[in-house]
Amino acid sequence: MLTCRWCAETYDETDSLDCNDTGFWCDICDGFTFYHPSEQTKHRLLLLLEQKGSGSAPQQVIPSVQKLRKRLSPLRYPGGKSKLIDYLYTKLSAENLETFVEVFAGGASLGLSLLDAGIIQCLVLNDKDPGVYALWKTILESPQELLTRLHGAAPTHQDLAEAKAVLSSGSASMSDLAWSFLLANRLSYSGIVKANPLGGKNGSEEALLSRWNPKRLETNILHIHSMKNKIALYNMDACDFLTEFGYWHRNSTCFIDPPYYLQGPKLYNCFFTEADHRELAECIQSLYREFPEADMILTYDDHPCIRELYPLAQQEFVQRHYSLRT
């Protein structure tokens, strides 16, 4: 007797079902059930919900099992995962680390750390934001274009204003988009491209350049470029990317870090609407239910709507101290 793990429909050996060597598809709900339940543990959907911690709350103890470099990315991001790298590493399954897929690459701090440490063999980055994509593409293919500008005069408030205009225009060259995004990210409050300059619109040059470190940026850019043969890059809508490319790597993990549910519109150029969050949830859970392939780890700010959107996910909570800084 066979029983669908999703809708509990039962079948006997005489029923004709779509199946493969590992399991079968239910003709009622289209869900896939493994013959051996232990196989399901290799194909998780784990939702990590970030809760805002108070200053007096006890810090989570993260086991130090692997030395990971956390500052390889040239980008600064609100909600970036550099501070959670050690914690996230403990959530990864060793048998699913041949390929690591970042569906919303952003600063890609987790993937870069894993690739640098030799934990993964291949890193796949996707980001729909033209500026983010342009920067990664330029770092991988023609980093000298960035380095030449880094070696030039220190950027000014006017340079930042022009960079933001380039990002808004949608018609710049790949090189100009990449440089403009790097400038806007490094010189704006908390790395938010939409935010005011560091130190304010009429602030000092010293305040504006407080997070501008050409030497360190050059080192990071060159190091990432040195790993280019192990990095694949895409510029696609998240759902299209998952269904066409990202999800179908065997022995892999898809790391899905969408724009924040509550603050996303204030923080990102490519933010999500309510409908976008819902569409992503439907896409992810449909893949998980019908075609179990890659491990999927999803991170979100904790909100009742997000919990309701992911009934199929194993939900865990992580306490995080959020801050918007210079």
Task: Label every PLM stretch briefly.
Residues 1-4, 23:
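Residues immediately within or flanking Cys/His clusters that coordinate Zn2+
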Residues 55-91, 140-255, 259-265, 279-282, ...:
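SAM-dependent nucleic-acid methyltransferase catalytic core
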Residues 15-23:
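Short linker/helix segments within small regulatory modules
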Residues 29-47:
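Short metal-binding segments enriched for Cys and/or His
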Residues 261, 271-326:
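Long, positively charged, glycine-interspersed low-complexity recognition regions
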